[in-house]
């Protein structure tokens, strides 16, 4: 079984990831032949974006199964708990990571025997990856209906093919609209401190021939005031039961500005990102990353030695600021606490 997309390649023996830390200057790849190597790749942001992290973890689980394999099924299940724990401890905010690992573990236990288990787990990981692509295309189709011909969309971070197995969530909506023949322009904010907008979104859209303009983060409000923005579309790392959205740091700021200027603020996310067990955004753990991501840029120090740094990787946007949540099952509007539940009742 093999899979190859812009973000990842599964050869059957290893997981090869495009190194997103190096884009756009260099296109390099990192080969992961063990579950611990996959864990390091997730932790170090070789791969990032909630759906891409989830799929990578699923393939990491497969590699771990091969490393931990023993003939006794119960002993094997026990050893796989360690694999799951190592992979789960990489990034705390993205719920797709835990969703994918729980699905892999449930599949293992449901299969219930040692014969053929490695092949079965590989097939399940492939299913997770392939389903993600189809889900993203469905999100794109639903979301494209919200965009008019000639619209300019502001994006934050990267919720494109690079953040998923392929096609993307927020950028998937833009791709789908363009495929429908609509003329869509994109303003991509740079997304400090990791510059996913400048490095990844701009690179990805230019590869697709989609009209993209790069702005710094502090230009988004003025761009809105000048009437240059018709809609905002972002992805999500976790959506709480009440509609609060955890996403890349700076998302909350963009949402507040959109509200102030009467611009619709859309969140594009698969149902696997919706966590009904998390009541509100206050219950979402927010990862904090190393201070050098703020004090350095492009490998060069830009701040004084010893300065204190606060570097949360994510923030939480209140549900009241979200116009709608675009999923593979349709577009969800407020009240979110009621309507998000309906997605899982169908």
UniProtKB/Swiss-Prot annotation:
Highest rank taxon of the organism: Bacteria
E.C. number(s) listed in UniProt: 5.3.1.23
Main enzyme class: isomerase
Transmembrane segments: none
Gene3D superfamilies: translation initiation factor eif-2b, domain 1, Translation initiation factor eif-2b, domain 2
Active-site residues (renumbered): 237
InterPro entries named among the record's database cross-references: IF-2B-related, IF-M1Pi, IF_2B-like_C, Initiation_fac_2B_a/b/d, M1Pi_N, NagB/RpiA_transferase-like
Gene Ontology BP annotations: L-methionine salvage from methylthioadenosine
One GO MF term: S-methyl-5-thioribose-1-phosphate isomerase activity
Pathways involved: Amino-acid biosynthesis; L-methionine biosynthesis via salvage pathway; L-methionine from S-methyl-5-thio-alpha-D-ribose 1-phosphate: step 1/6
Annotated site (Transition state stabilizer): 157
Chemical reaction(s) catalysed: 5-(methylsulfanyl)-alpha-D-ribose 1-phosphate = 5-(methylsulfanyl)-D-ribulose 1-phosphate
Keywords, alphabetical: Amino-acid biosynthesis, Isomerase, Methionine biosynthesis
Binding positions for substrate per the UniProt entry: 48-50, 91, 196, 247-248
Described purpose of this protein according to its UniProt entry: Catalyzes the interconversion of methylthioribose-1-phosphate (MTR-1-P) into methylthioribulose-1-phosphate (MTRu-1-P).
HAMAP family xrefs: Salvage_MtnA
Family as reported in the entry's similarity comment: Belongs to the eIF-2B alpha/beta/delta subunits family. MtnA subfamily.
NCBIfam families on file: eIF-2B_rel, PRK05720.1, salvage_mtnA
The protein's name: Methylthioribose-1-phosphate isomerase
Organism expressing this protein natively: Thermosipho africanus (strain TCF52B)
């Amino acid at each position: 079984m093999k899979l190859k997309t812009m973000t990842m390649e599964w050869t059957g023996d290893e997981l090869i990831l495009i190194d997103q830390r190096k884009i756009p200057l260099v296109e390099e790849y990192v080969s992961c032949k063990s579950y611990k190597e996959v864990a390091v790749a997730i932790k170090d942001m070789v791969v990032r974006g909630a759906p891409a992290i989830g799929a990578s973890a699923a393939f990491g689980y497969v590699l771990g199964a091969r490393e931990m394999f023993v003939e006794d099924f119960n002993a094997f299940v026990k050893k796989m708990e360690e694999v799951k724990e190592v992979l789960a401890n990489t990034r705390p905010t993205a719920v797709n990571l835990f969703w994918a690992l729980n699905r892999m573990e449930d599949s293992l236990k449901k299969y219930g025997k040692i014969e053929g288990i490695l092949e079965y787990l590989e097939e399940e990981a492939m299913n997770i990856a392939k389903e993600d692509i189809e889900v993203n295309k469905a999100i794109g189709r639903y979301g494209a209906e919200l965009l008019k011909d000639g619209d300019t969309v502001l994006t934050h971070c990267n919720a494109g093919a690079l953040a998923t197995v392929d096609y993307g969530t927020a950028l998937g909506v833009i791709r789908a609209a363009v495929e429908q023949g609509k003329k869509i322009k994109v303003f991509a904010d740079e997304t400090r401190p990791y510059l996913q907008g400048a490095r990844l979104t701009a690179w990805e859209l230019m590869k697709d021939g989609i009209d993209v303009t790069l702005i710094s983060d502090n230009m988004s409000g003025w761009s809105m005031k000048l009437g240059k923005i018709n809609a905002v579309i972002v992805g999500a790392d976790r959506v709480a039961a009440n509609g609060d959205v955890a996403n890349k740091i700076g998302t909350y700021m963009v949402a507040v500005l959109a509200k102030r200027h009467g611009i619709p603020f859309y969140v594009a996310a698969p149902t696997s990102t919706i966590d009904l067990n998390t009541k509100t955004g206050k219950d979402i753990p927010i990862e904090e990353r190393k201070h050098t991501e703020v004090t350095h840029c492009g490998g060069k120090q830009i701040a004084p030695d010893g300065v204190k740094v606060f570097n949360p990787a994510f923030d939480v946007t209140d549900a009241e600021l979200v116009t709608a949540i675009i999923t593979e099952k349709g577009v969800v509007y407020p009240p979110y606490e009621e309507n998000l539940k309906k997605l899982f009742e169908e």
